[in-house]
Amino acid sequence: MPTEYFEARERALLGQRYETLYAAPSDSAARGVTVSALRTTPGTFAAKADMALEPSPFCKAAFVVREETFKPGRHPYHHAGVFYSQEPSAASAAPLLGVKPGMRVLDLCAAPGGKSSQLAAALQGQGLLVSNEYVAARADILKSNLERMGVPNAVILNEAPARIAEALPEFFDRVLVDAPCSGEGMFRKEAVAVTQHSEALVKQCAELGAQILDCAAAVLAPGGQLVYSTCTFAPEEDEGQVAAFLQRHPEFTLADALGNVDYTFGSEGEANRTGGLPLDVTRVRRVWPCQGGEGHFMARLVKAGTPRALPAPGEYRPEEQLWLEAAAQAGKKAGKGKGKPTKGFDKADARSARREASRGCHEAVQGRNTRTRDAGAGEATPAQSLAAWQEFAARYFPALAQRPAVVHGGGVLLPVPFPQTTLHVLRAGVFVGSVQKGRFVPEHHLFTAFGAQCTNREELTLTDPRTVEYLSGREIEARTAADGWCCVTVDGWPLGGGKVSGGRVKNHYPKALRLL
C-alpha cells in the first residue's frame, strides 16, 4: 500500500485519473528478462528457453515472464549470461541512448548491472563501457553481474560521481544516469520501499539527483547524449528535475526520448509536475503501472556541439591506441622483472590477494609500482606469469594470444583503452588468470567473456542432467572435450571452466555462484 503522503500528492496531481493509472494488470509485481546480444537474439532465446514469455513493449530485447514460480537465478541461461532478470519497464531506459559500437559509454549509477548489461550488448565488445557504483558492496555485485554476462570491454569503478567528473571531463559519447531515487515504482516489489518512503526522502533524492546530473553534464563530450531515468513518480525527481537541469545547463537541449528507437511505449510527461519551470513534457516518457511496468521516468538530453567521429569497426581512436600501447609496455616491463617467490603464502593469503587483485590489476595498467598479489603470485615471477598465459592462450584461446596483456604479480589482465587516473578501479578489462603451483589457472571471467573462442569445449544442453550437476559444483562426464582445460557450454553459451582428465570434467565453476 502506498504511503499517505504519496497517495495525497498523486491524487492532487492526477485527479480522476489516479485510479486508472495506478491500476496494475495483476496483483503481483511485473517480472521480465532482457536478452543479451552478446549471446544471442531474442527469437533464438524464446525458442530455446522453455519459459512462458510475452514480448515486452519497453525493449525489443526483453520479455515479460508470466510464470509466478519462475526463479531466474536457477536457470542455466542466467548462469550463461544469456539474459538479465529485471522489472520490464526498467529495460526501457538504456536503448534510448542510441549506443553504437566504438562509443565510450558511462553508466554513472550502475548497480546491480541490468542497464549496464544492455549498454554492453549495444557496444558489441567494441569501444568502452565504464560502469560506476558509489556503494562498495553494490559495486562488487555489479562486477559479478558483468562478469556473468561476459562483458569484455568494461571498466568498473567504485567512485563518487564528482571525482569521475574531475578525472574525465568531456570523455564520454553517451551517459546514463539511472539516479538513486525515492523508489515509488518499487512499492509492490519491495516492502522496504514503502516503509522508508517520505516527503523528506523525495527531497533528499531530488537534491542528490541534481548533483549527479551536473557531474554527468561535465563528463559528456560535445554532441553527446545523456539519458536520465528514475523508478519513481515524484515530480521533484522527474519532470521538475529535468526542467531545473535545463535552467542550469543552457548547453543542453531536451530531445524526444524515443528519438533513437523505432517503437513507442508509455505516456508523455505531465505538465503539472515541472515545478513551474518550462519543459516540453511531450518529449519525456513515463511508464505507469497500468501500462505493464512498475513505473519509470525517462528524458534524453543532448549537449551542444559536433559529435566525435567513431573509429572503424575493430579499431581504436588514436588516443585509445596510445593507452593500449602504454598498457602493453607496462606489461612488458613487469614481464622483465626478477621478483622472488613469496614463501608462506597460505590459503587465507590467497583469498585476500584475490580480493585485492581486481583493484590492483588496473594499477598495473597505469604503470604504477604496486605490490598487490594475486592468488599464487608468490609462485611465479612476472615473466613466468606472462609466458604461462601466452602458452595457455596459444593452446586454448589462440585469438587472444597476441593481444596486449598486463602482468600484475601472478595475475594476467587483458586491458581496455582507458587513461591513467586516480579513480578507484575494481576491474579494467578481463582478468584471465594466474599461475598457481607452477601452472596457469584460468579465471571464470575468461570463459564467460571469450568462451565461444575456446578450442576445447564440453557441450551441454538445457535438458542434459549434467548441466545442473555442473552448476551445482559436481564433476561431470566428458563427452565432447579432450583432456585439458575446457569451456563448459549450454546450448553453445559459456557457463564456465573445467579441466578434463580420465573422461571426467573437474569442476571449476566458482563456489559462490553454484546452485544450492
Predicted segments with their positions:
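Short beta-strand element of Class I
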Residues: 126-130
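Helix-to-beta-strand junctions that scaffold the AdoMet/dcAdoMet cofactor pocket
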Residues: 123-124, 220-222
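Polybasic, low-complexity RNA-engagement segments
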Residues: 1-48, 304-516
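Class I SAM-dependent transferase core
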Residues: 54, 58-99, 142, 500, ...
